């Protein structure tokens, strides 16, 4: 065992303090010896020397338990001295409980553990059977338990001598706060020799004297506090320098709640409102409580069984960054304002309301449960019927967990699990339940309210007034006296208020008008308590007031109204009479006869004009008939004797009018070129398969089945990309049959096949007219010259009209229509053919006129000069035709040799014409084949010239190199020059060359072959002053420069320029185009049947909302906004010609319709300014900041919808409005006018005008009313 370390007394045994402790300890020992009864009760117990099972005691020598008891008594005594006078009582109690056990202390349990183990936490209840009680047990079971425990212990084998060893520590004595009166509480010293100054220090050997106290507690009253004897001690009079005595703790001011550092629930953000009429609409409650802060959630509680309103409303507020004036308001502050304001007799309707704080919804839940319980007690029949239904369900269902759960729910006033989720609309259990009145309020004398129910604005006529809206200063009866005192410096007549706001009314005179204006100037936007008085001054009274008309005017209006009604009635009677006569005289045969007569008359007139009148006029105007008269008058003869061409157009503007093809007509083509010649019979071509193709109009089921596409490898498809072998018309079958809709009609061949056949006839007719040319002294046949002249003159106009008709059809059809796709392909084919014709200059000048002019120039000269004149012209003409045959190339090579041949003039002409034999002109696009450059070896006869002339201006691209290398010698030289360079891996050579040539053709607008200029866009490649763009730094490109090279802007700019030029040159065509656009706008905007059904349901839903909601200011905008959320207008964004991206309509939109909401992140003005600077620094040039009011801005730059892509226009088709929905402001885009499909949406940004500014933003809208700048 380890010894305790030596202390101070061991080293200094003669120290005064050590001696004093020894004397004190000796005095305590003597005092303990003098009082044995109170200190040690163990000697008073009679203990036998031998162990006795019945007695349960033994001597100290034979029984070791006694020794343990004595040691524990001594330890307890020592503790009792330390704690006061409580040790003797505790010791006596513990000893009596310990020694009163009936079992002998030495009895051990069968498991070898003694039952007398002393544990500090053992009590009577926790002791196991056959175990004596704890030494700290109660006295109640001390003697009665002995007879019961003795047999049990005997059953285990009788007494056995065991050694009892205490476990760990002895039991802790139980210290009493109030010991018995007979116990000594303590000792106090009455004489201390160390403090006696009468005796010298050497004589101070007397012993200290002690006196006990606590024995007679009744005789000795408790001593009083000596500090209370001092006057005003509790107020700090005892010591001025020390702190004031405070018997109670300080009442500190509570700390403000901080969610980051505070612990526990925060301040309440929810209130519960009662006392109003249960039938009050929720809009009225929201209008009142939204004046205290932004409402996050509002719930008008209902009965879950019947669905009726209970008159209890829970309102939860949310934090607002800028609430009515820019101040930030938290949800707890809003709740506090609402709670304090509604204590002052607030009313909703005619009832006073009561507001209570509801932190977690407990208060509202308790109120709802109380009201539901009251209703059950008031209508027991309804509850019994519900219980019966529930009981039937319980009988049908097995009893289990579900039934227990239903019982628990019924105990908690909740509906059962089998109950419906909401009230049924067809239930007959709807008794007339009385509305709860809410919590009882303190009855006070009713104060007359100064808030008028009748709108004040309707009562004001010409009196000057100032209006303060309720959204700036809440309407309260108590605010009116404060407002009157606030405006006491001004001479007003009355201050009135209604639910819209406050009206300060002045007298109706000039002085009143001036006083109203002065009050407005001095008090506008000033403070009234914590609100801002945003005033609206009307010095001339109600602007909407109209004086009642005079009696004479009323009489005149009545006479006019009666006259209009009379005329309307007479018109209706006439219409009814006409209908009746039509029904009586209805005869289909007579009606058909009248229609037939009209058509025959028109046809007869047309035949007379074309077959009788026109030939007669031309015969009369024949030049040969007037030779004598011309000679008599001295008029020279006309130059040509041939009959001039004659043309009859169906329309005066040059357009071709197409009609719907007749299903029973046998003429596949309309009146073509031959019908325009009055002297020629109509030529009807027999088309192969015409009967089968025309039968489709009669019955679409006779259409031939489309053949399947042949599968080809990718390489062959790449080579045959431009070969049109499979038509889309063969693959498409109409889904709508036997209808008159545009979608159900097959593609009309009036504008395609007829025009194609006409073009083919024209091209085939041009070559015979050229090949059959004869010397000029022989006149041509009249029919050939007339027909050729008509066709050549009418070809460009007819082709142009067909293209315009196709474009008009494309614009009128919807985007998803298959017919529109076919028309687009047809239009592209015709435009490509027209470009080829322009390239070959076929319609610029007829070939026969070129031959005639060449022949006329060749007549006066000799044959050699004529040959030199005619042959280069024809050769130059042939060079422009790419589809030449090998015979033509051979004739060109033989042309220099033919110069030496001497022949006559007619033979010369025929030789020159034979250069283009019949059938050798190939002007079809698929037959275009580039000629291989070759060297014509020969000897020049007139002057020396090089064998091959190289053009140095040709751009050396793929086509340029191919034109530069003409023979094998050039190939060998090129190989030697490139021998040092490694060959690049380009894969398939044919595919690589085809790809590069196609890219070049696309970039150059279809031009192929060698070119003399680089492929670039003018104005796009801007040279840098330093020679490198990297050394120039960052700079912004102007929008005007972007318009020069961006493809979509170039396209729009070209279209705009062409439109303006066309309108300037041909005003009639511009007027026709405007009429077409107007007709397109007036087209039916009908949609599919399912869409119409959905629209009808939506309208019914909106009408139901209109009936449910009260009609207040702004309700129409709210309803239309709800409609917008349910059915959004289909819009899309794409590249815009104005700026970057734009928004386009995907369907026709009517005027005043809501299109889309401008959504984004709501920020304050200061944050918006900071973000705008940050965006400019980061390179985001576009601004998507939209201001709602003075302090709030919507930022849609990074968090926004597609409405931010709407561009600016000086003549827009949309406008932006700010509406208020559920207490928050929203930005919605409206349509100003009817918007067509695929039209870009624009609105006016309304930037402030900046004068003499260098940083003005140019406007690129390109409209007729463009101002040039946005600011």
UniProtKB/Swiss-Prot annotation:
Keywords tagged on the record: Chromatin regulator, Chromosome, Methyltransferase, Nucleus, S-adenosyl-L-methionine, Transferase
Single GO term (MF): RNA binding
InterPro entries in the cross-refs: COMPASS_Set1_N-SET, Nucleotide-bd_a/b_plait_sf, Post-SET_dom, RBD_domain_sf, Set1-like, Set1_fungi, SET_assoc, SET_dom
EC numbers: 2.1.1.354
Family the UniProt entry places it in: Belongs to the class V-like SAM-binding methyltransferase superfamily.
Domain notes: The RxxxRR motif forms an adapter helix that bridges the nucleosome and ubiquitin.
Name by which UniProt lists this protein: Histone-lysine N-methyltransferase, H3 lysine-4 specific
Organism: Coccidioides immitis (strain RS)
């Amino acid at each position: 065992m380890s010894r305790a370390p030596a202390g101070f007394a061991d080293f200094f045994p003669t120290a005064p303090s050590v001696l004093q402790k020894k004397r004190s300890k000796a005095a305590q020992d003597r005092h303990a010896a003098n009082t044995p009864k109170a200190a040690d009760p163990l000697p008073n117990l009679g203990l036998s020397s031998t162990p006795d099972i019945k007695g349960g005691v033994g001597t100290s020598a034979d029984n070791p338990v006694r020794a343990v008891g004595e040691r524990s008594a001594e330890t307890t005594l020592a503790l009792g001295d330390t704690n006061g006078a409580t040790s003797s009582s505790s010791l006596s109690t513990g000893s009596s409980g310990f020694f009163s056990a009936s079992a002998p202390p030495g009895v051990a349990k069968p498991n070898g553990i003694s039952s007398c183990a002393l544990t500090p936490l053992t009590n009577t209840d926790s002791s196991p059977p056959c175990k004596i009680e704890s030494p700290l047990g109660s006295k109640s079971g001390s003697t009665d338990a002995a007879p019961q425990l003795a047999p049990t212990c005997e059953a285990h084998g009788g007494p056995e001598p065991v050694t009892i060893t205490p476990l760990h520590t002895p039991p802790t004595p139980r210290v009493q706060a109030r010991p018995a009166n007979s116990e000594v509480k303590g000792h106090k010293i009455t004489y201390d020799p160390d403090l006696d100054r009468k005796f010298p220090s050497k004589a101070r050997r007397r012993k200290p004297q002690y006196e006990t106290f606590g024995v007679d507690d009744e005789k000795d009253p408790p001593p009083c506090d000596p500090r209370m004897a001092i006057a005003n001690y509790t107020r700090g009079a005892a010591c001025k320098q020390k702190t004031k005595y405070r018997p109670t703790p300080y009442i500190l001011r509570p700390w403000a709640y901080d969610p980051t550092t505070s612990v526990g629930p925060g301040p309440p953000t929810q209130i519960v409102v009662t006392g109003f009429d249960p039938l009050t609409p929720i809009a009225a409650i929201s209008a009142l409580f939204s004046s205290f802060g932004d409402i996050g959630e509002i719930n008008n509680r209902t009965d879950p069984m019947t669905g009726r309103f209970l008159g209890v409303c829970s309102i939860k507020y949310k934090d607002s960054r800028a609430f009515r004036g820019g101040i930030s308001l938290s949800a707890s502050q809003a709740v506090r304002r609402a709670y304090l304001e509604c204590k002052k007799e607030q009313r909703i309707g005619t009832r006073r309301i009561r507001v209570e704080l509801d932190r977690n919804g407990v208060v509202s839940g308790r109120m709802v449960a109380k009201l539901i319980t009251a209703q059950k007690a008031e209508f027991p029949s309804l509850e019994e019927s519900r219980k019966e239904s529930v009981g039937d369900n319980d009988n049908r269902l097995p009893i289990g967990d579900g039934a227990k759960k239903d019982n628990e729910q019924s105990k908690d006033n909740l509906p059962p699990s089998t109950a419906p989720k909401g009230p049924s609309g067809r239930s007959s259990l709807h008794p007339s339940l009385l509305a709860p009145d809410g919590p009882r309020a303190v009855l006070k004398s009713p104060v007359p309210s100064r808030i008028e129910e009748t709108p004040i604005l309707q009562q004001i006529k010409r009196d000057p007034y100032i209006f303060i809206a309720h959204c700036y200063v809440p309407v309260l009866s108590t605010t009116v006296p404060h407002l009157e005192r606030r405006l006491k410096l001004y001479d007003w007549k009355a201050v009135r208020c209604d639910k819209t706001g406050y009206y300060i009314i002045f007298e109706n005179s000039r002085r009143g008008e001036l006083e109203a204006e002065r009050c407005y100037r001095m008090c506008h936007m000033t403070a009234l308590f914590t609100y801002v008085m945003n005033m609206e001054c009307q010095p001339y009274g109600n602007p909407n007031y109209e004086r009642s008309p005079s009696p004479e005017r009323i009489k005149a209006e009545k006479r006019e109204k009666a006259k209009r009604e009379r005329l309307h009635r007479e018109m209706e009677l006439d219409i009814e009479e006409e209908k009746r006569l039509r029904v009586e005289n209805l005869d289909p045969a007579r009606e058909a006869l009248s229609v037939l007569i009209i058509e025959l008359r028109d046809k007869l007139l047309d035949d007379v004009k074309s077959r009788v009148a026109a030939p007669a006029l031309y015969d009369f105007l024949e030049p040969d008939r007037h030779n004598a008269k011309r000679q008599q008058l001295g008029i020279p003869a006309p130059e040509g004797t041939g009959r001039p061409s004659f043309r009859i157009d169906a329309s005066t503007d040059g357009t071709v009018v197409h009609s719907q093809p007749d299903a029973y007509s046998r003429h596949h083509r309309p009146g073509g070129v031959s019908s325009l010649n009055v002297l020629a019979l109509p030529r009807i071509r027999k088309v192969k398969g015409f009967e089968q193709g025309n039968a489709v109009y009669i019955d679409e089921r006779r259409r031939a089945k489309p053949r399947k596409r042949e599968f080809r490898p990718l390489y062959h498809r790449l080579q045959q990309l431009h070969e049109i072998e499979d038509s889309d018309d063969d693959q498409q079958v109409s889904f709508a049959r036997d209808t008159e809709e545009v979608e159900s009609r097959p593609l009309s061949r009036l504008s395609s096949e007829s025009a194609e056949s006409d073009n083919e006839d024209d091209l085939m007719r041009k070559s015979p007219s050229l090949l059959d040319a004869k010397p000029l002294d022989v006149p041509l046949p009249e029919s050939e010259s007339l027909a050729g002249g008509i066709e050549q003159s009418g070809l460009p106009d007819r082709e142009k009209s067909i293209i315009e008709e196709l474009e008009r059809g494309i614009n009128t059809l919807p985007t998803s229509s298959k017919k529109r796709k076919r028309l687009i392909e047809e239009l592209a084919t015709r435009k490509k053919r027209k470009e080829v014709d322009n390239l070959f200059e076929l319609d610029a000048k007829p070939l026969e006129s070129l031959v005639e002019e060449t022949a006329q120039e060749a007549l006066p000269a000799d044959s050699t000069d004529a040959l030199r004149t005619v042959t280069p012209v024809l050769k130059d003409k042939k060079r422009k035709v790419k589809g030449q045959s090998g015979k033509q190339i051979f004739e060109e090579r033989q042309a220099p040799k033919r110069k030496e041949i001497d022949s006559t003039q007619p033979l010369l002409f025929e030789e020159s014409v034979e250069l283009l034999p019949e059938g050798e002109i190939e002007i079809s696009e698929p037959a275009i084949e580039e000629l291989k450059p070759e060297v014509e070896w020969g000897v020049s006869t007139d002057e020396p010239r090089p064998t091959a002339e190289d053009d140095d201006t040709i751009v050396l691209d793929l086509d340029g190199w191919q034109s530069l290398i003409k023979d094998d010698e050039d190939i060998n030289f090129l190989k030697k020059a490139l021998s040092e360079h490694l060959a690049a891996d380009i894969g398939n050579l044919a595919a690589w060359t085809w790809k590069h040539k196609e890219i070049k053709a696309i970039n150059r607008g279809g031009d192929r072959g060698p070119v003399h200029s680089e492929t670039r866009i003018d104005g796009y490649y801007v040279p840098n002053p330093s020679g490198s763009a990297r050394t120039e730094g960052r700079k912004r490109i102007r929008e005007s420069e972007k318009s020069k090279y961006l493809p979509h802007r170039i396209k729009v700019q070209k279209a705009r320029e062409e439109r303006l030029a066309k309108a300037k040159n041909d005003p009639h065509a511009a007027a026709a185009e405007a009429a077409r656009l107007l007709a397109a706008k007036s087209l039916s905007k009908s949609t599919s049947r399912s869409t119409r059904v959905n629209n009808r349901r939506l309208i019914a839903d909106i009408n139901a909302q209109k009936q449910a909601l009260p009609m207040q200011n702004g309700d129409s905008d709210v309803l239309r906004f709800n409609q917008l959320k349910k059915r959004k207008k289909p819009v899309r964004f794409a590249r815009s010609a104005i700026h970057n991206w734009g928004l386009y309509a995907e369907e026709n939109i009517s005027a005043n319709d809501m299109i889309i909401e401008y959504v984004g992140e709501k920020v304050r003005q200061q944050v918006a300014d900071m973000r705008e600077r940050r965006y400019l620094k980061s390179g985001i040039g576009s601004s998507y900041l939209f201001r709602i009011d003075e302090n709030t801005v919507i930022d849609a730059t990074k968090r926004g919808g597609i409405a931010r892509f709407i561009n600016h226009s000086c003549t827009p088709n949309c406008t932006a409005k700010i509406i208020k929905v559920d207490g928050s402001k929203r930005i919605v885009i409206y349509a100003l006018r009817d918007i067509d499909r695929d039209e870009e949406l624009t609105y006016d940004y309304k930037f402030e005008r900046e004068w003499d500014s260098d940083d003005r933003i140019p406007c690129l809208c390109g409209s007729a009313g463009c101002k040039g700048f946005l600011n």
